[in-house]
C-alpha cells in the first residue's frame, strides 16, 4: 500500500480526453483513448510524478458509466505502473463510490481520489465513517482525500 511519504514532486490532474462529438447530447463512448494515451505519456515525459484522473473537472458526474470504465481501464493500462495513478471515484452516494472503487480495484491503479458524497450536508463523523468504509472494503487501494468544504458541505 502506498503512503503519503511515497508521493512527491508534481501531481498532474488529467482531464478526460474527449472525442470530437463529446458535446453532442446523443454522443456515447466519448473518451478518446488515443488522446488519453498521448496526454498521459506527455505528462509523464514532462516530469509528472503522480497522475490523477476523473476528478473535479466534471468527469465524476458527467461521464456515462461505460465511459468512466473506459477511462479508468485505459489510463491504468497506458500508465503501466510508471508513476502512481489515482483515479477519481467520487459519487453522489456511497453505493456509486463503491461501484467505481470496484472498477479501479480491478486495474493496476495505485488508488482512488475521493470526495465525500455531498448532495446533502454531512458531519465530520459521517465523512470519517465514509472513508473508513471505503478503506475496509478496498484494502489494496490507496485513498487520496479530496476535501473541498464549500462543495462537499462538510469541513474535516
Language-model-derived ranges and their functions:
Residues 2-155:
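Active-site beta->alpha loop and helix N-cap motifs at the rims of alpha/beta catalytic domains
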Amino acid at each position: 500500500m502506498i503512503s503519503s511519504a511515497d508521493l512527491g514532486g508534481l501531481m498532474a490532474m488529467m482531464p478526460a480526453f474527449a472525442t470530437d462529438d463529446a458535446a453532442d447530447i446523443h454522443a456515447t463512448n466519448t473518451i478518446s483513448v488515443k488522446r488519453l494515451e498521448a496526454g498521459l505519456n506527455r505528462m509523464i515525459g514532462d516530469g509528472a510524478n503522480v497522475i490523477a484522473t476523473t476528478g473535479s473537472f466534471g468527469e465524476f458526474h458527467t461521464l456515462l458509466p461505460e465511459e468512466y470504465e473506459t477511462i479508468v481501464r485505459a489510463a491504468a493500462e497506458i500508465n503501466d505502473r510508471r508513476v502512481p495513478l489515482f483515479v477519481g471515484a467520487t459519487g453522489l452516494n456511497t453505493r456509486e463510490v463503491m461501484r467505481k472503487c470496484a472498477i479501479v480495484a480491478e486495474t493496476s491503479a495505485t488508488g482512488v481520489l475521493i470526495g465525500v458524497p455531498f448532495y446533502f450536508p454531512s458531519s465530520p463523523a459521517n465523512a470519517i465513517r465514509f472513508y473508513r468504509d471505503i478503506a475496509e472494503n478496498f484494502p489494496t487501494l490507496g485513498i487520496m482525500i479530496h476535501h473541498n468544504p464549500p462543495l462537499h458541505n462538510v469541513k474535516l
